[in-house]
Amino acid sequence: MRRAGLIKPLLRINNEKQRVWRKNYATQVVSGLEECSLDPKEYVDFKRQLRQLNLPHKDGHTCLQLECRLCDRNRQPVTNAQKGTDHGLLAYVNKRTGAFICPNCDVKTSLTSALLSYQLPKPVGYKQPLQRQPVYESRFPHLAVVTPEACAALGIKGLKEDQLNAIGAQWEPQQQLLHFKLRNAAQVEVGEKVLYLGDRREEIFQSSSSSGLLIHGAMNKTKAVLVSNLIDFIVLATQNIETHCVVCLPYELKTLPQECLPALERFKELIFWLHYDASHSWDAARAFALKLDERRCLLIRPTETEPAPHLALRRRLNLRHILAKATPVQHKAITTFGAMRNDILSELQNIEKVNGVKWKRFPVLNKLLKGHRRGELTILTGPTGSGKTTFMSEYSLDLAMQGVNTLWGSFEIRNTRLAATLLRQYVGYPLDDRLHEFNHWAAEFERLPLYFMTFHGQQPLKPVLEAIEHASYVHDVMHVIIDNLQFMMGVSTFRGDKFFEQDSIIAAFRSFATKHNVHVTLVMHPRKERQEDELTTSSVFGTAKATQEADNVLIIQDKRLTSVRGKKYLQIAKNRYSGDLGIMPLEFDKDGLSYSTQIQNAKRKREKTPSEN
């Protein structure tokens, strides 16, 4: 199977498509694992090898569990007391990516490399992967037991300091924060998560190669409640819920690294009870459920009577009754209004979040499209040279700055040029004459959740779909941009009608957007029209299927070359969500490569202020 790669913006471009680089977030996980798509044949061969060696293994919800042959501890005899109880002796193989992870010896390698260690005799030239005992050094050396004053500062009614100490909380008096340890599936400490009592801000610190979870509850429990922040974790963990463990996600609703999945394998039921504090996080539970196996996942939709745990406690609602009302994420083929009633009420009470992420640079789009929503298909078209890529760069940058994980597939221009355009739009002016500022802005820009496919030029559909499916699973990508669709035609084994081929490609992206709940934006060229004629939905190249499948159709109209007073504007020609159609004027700022009137007005204000003084 051909593996697809992603690059780290502005820092490294890898031309070998088999490599994948994970972006380094501020306060987000930095994975040392070489991530790749799993070849099903490798996985089948690996399981066959285990059967031939009579090695016990178990197919879990997301991982294959087996004895680690790379771990030094496993070369020593295992006592009867350890059998079946010591999770540190287990290794995990992710069934989607093929990542081989041992949380005990911190070995992370590909399935191909791990397969060699299970072969007898060992192949010639075989080298044992480097093992290192995960050791995490805390950034907070002055930790103490929680004091009554610290407990009172949380503002949770009825909470005692003894309860906080019992769930593993520690107090850092100098910075006025509560501290919790994060552990992996082997119960090894790999990081820490802290809550500043002053502004209720949370921060996470992890070791460079691991990612852990905060779990409270007995090891024999098979049900768990997943929450997104420490306040909700404290509320539920101190309520003595006998049937469920309480799990705090490490990165709130931004991403769920695959290194966290082994620690959740033992649970047969997972209930998402999340606090949705931003529009882009509204569908996070469904996205995480796809990664964790939908069949074991349930969901508590936020309503006035079923809010987040800390809000429910403040309103004196019965937490156990709310927990009992959790509904399956995966619905049956046929349902009733009664089954959907709570979902509908939740959407009506949270309509702004349901509308999607609002653009800050393009307020007109907010009025017409209402927001950027996951699971939709958008088509952007316009004449050659009209600025489709430049506009889409700023359009996607606006969303990425608000936490929308974005994957760019630029087949027309190289990633270095695209990344340079995005950086210039981010800064607002060119950096070629201010090179001393580059490191500062590059470091700021690198914090954005942006990923790039390393494909360039014509590409067949299969490896591109493999790449975006991998990105949606590993990096929790919410927005995929393909620029442009015509570069994916004419290179497949299909030798039929080109319009039928394009329809097949569009159908594949439509299916992907719906199945994986990811917004897909396709940049397409229009068919050749007379310059004086306006483009319409029927001007999109190919058959009518493209615009029929799309939820949104955006057309850049450029009349500057055909009329003295001609203008350039973006036309919303189709809007399936709200039905509102209209236009947005496009005025281009060359310095910042920006079409945003907000940015341009701010720039004029800055230029005007010194002259007035």
UniProtKB/Swiss-Prot annotation:
Its EC number is 5.6.2.3. Changing C248A: Loss of ion and sulfide binding. Gene3D superfamilies: P-loop containing nucleotide triphosphate hydrolases (3.40.50.300). Residues 24-123 are annotated as: Zinc-binding domain (ZBD). Its cofactor is [2Fe-2S] cluster. SUPFAM superfamilies: P-loop containing nucleoside triphosphate hydrolases. One of its GO terms (molecular function) is lipid binding. GO terms for cellular component: mitochondrial chromosome; mitochondrial inner membrane; mitochondrial nucleoid; mitochondrion. It is found in: Mitochondrion; Mitochondrion matrix, Mitochondrion nucleoid; Mitochondrion inner membrane. Mitochondrial helicase involved in mtDNA replication. Might have a role in mtDNA repair. Has DNA strand separation activity needed to form a processive replication fork for leading strand synthesis which is catalyzed by the formation of a replisome complex with POLG and mtSDB. Preferentially unwinds DNA substrates with pre-existing 5'-and 3'- single-stranded tails but is also active on a 5'- flap substrate. Can dissociate the invading strand of immobile or mobile D-loop DNA structures irrespective of the single strand polarity of the third strand. Homohexamer (via C-terminus) which assembled in a ring-like structure. Homoheptamer which assembled in a ring-like structure. Oligomerization is Mg(2+), nucleotide and DNA-independent, however, Mg(2+) and nucleotide stabilize the homohexameric form. This is Mitochondrial DNA helicase. The gene is mtDNA-helicase.
